[in-house]
C-alpha cells in the first residue's frame, strides 16, 4: 500500500492508463495525417503504437518459430481479449479484419479506422463475395490480414465457434 492507504497496484493502473491515453493522443494525429495523405509510414505507426502499449502495460511477448517472409499472410487466431490486438499488431505490419459494429464504437472504432481495419458486415450475406474480394485485394497488395473469427473475445480457455 502507498502512504495514503491506496493499494500500489491501483496507483500503477492509474499511471498506466494516463500514460496510455497520452501515448494514444500523441500518435492519433500523426496517424490521421499519414492515412489522409496516403503516406507509406501509415503502415508503420500502428506497429510503433502497439509496441508502446505493450511496454506501458508491462507486457513481454515471446515468439516461437519463424515468421513467414516474402508473402502476405492471413492470420486466424482465437480472440481472448483486447490485448490480443496490441500483441498481434506489435508483431507484424497488418490490417485487422473486424465486425462492422466496431467501426461505430466511440474510442476503439476510431483507432481501428486509423489502422485501416477492414470492417465486415456478417449479416449481409449478399455481399459475401464483395467482402471476400476486398480481403483478397489487401493480400494481393502484400498486406498481412489478422482475423479473429469468433466475433467476440473469450477467457482463452477454449476455442469458440467461428462466425
List the predicted regions and their residue ranges.
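Soluble catalytic domains of membrane acyltransferases
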Residues: 55-163
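A transmembrane-helix-recognition feature enriched in membrane-embedded lipid enzymes
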Residues: 2-62, 110-115
Amino acid at each position: 500500500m502507498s502512504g495514503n492507504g491506496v493499494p500500489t497496484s491501483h496507483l500503477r493502473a492509474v499511471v498506466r492508463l494516463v500514460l496510455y491515453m497520452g501515448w494514444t493522443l500523441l500518435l492519433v494525429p500523426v496517424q490521421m495525417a499519414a492515412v489522409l495523405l496516403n503516406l507509406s509510414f501509415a503502415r508503420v505507426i500502428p506497429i510503433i503504437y502497439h509496441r508502446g502499449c505493450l511496454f506501458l502495460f508491462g507486457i513481454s511477448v515471446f515468439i516461437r518459430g519463424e515468421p513467414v517472409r516474402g508473402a502476405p499472410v492471413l492470420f486466424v487466431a482465437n480472440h481472448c481479449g483486447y490485448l490480443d490486438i496490441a500483441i498481434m499488431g506489435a508483431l507484424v505490419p497488418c490490417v485487422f479484419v473486424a465486425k462492422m459494429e466496431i467501426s461505430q464504437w466511440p474510442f476503439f472504432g476510431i483507432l481501428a479506422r486509423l489502422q485501416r481495419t477492414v470492417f465486415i458486415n456478417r449479416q449481409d450475406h449478399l455481399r459475401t463475395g464483395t467482402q471476400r474480394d476486398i480481403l483478397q485485394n489487401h493480400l494481393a497488395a502484400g498486406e498481412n490480414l489478422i482475423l479473429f473469427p469468433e466475433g467476440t473475445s473469450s477467457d482463452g480457455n477454449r476455442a469458440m465457434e467461428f462466425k
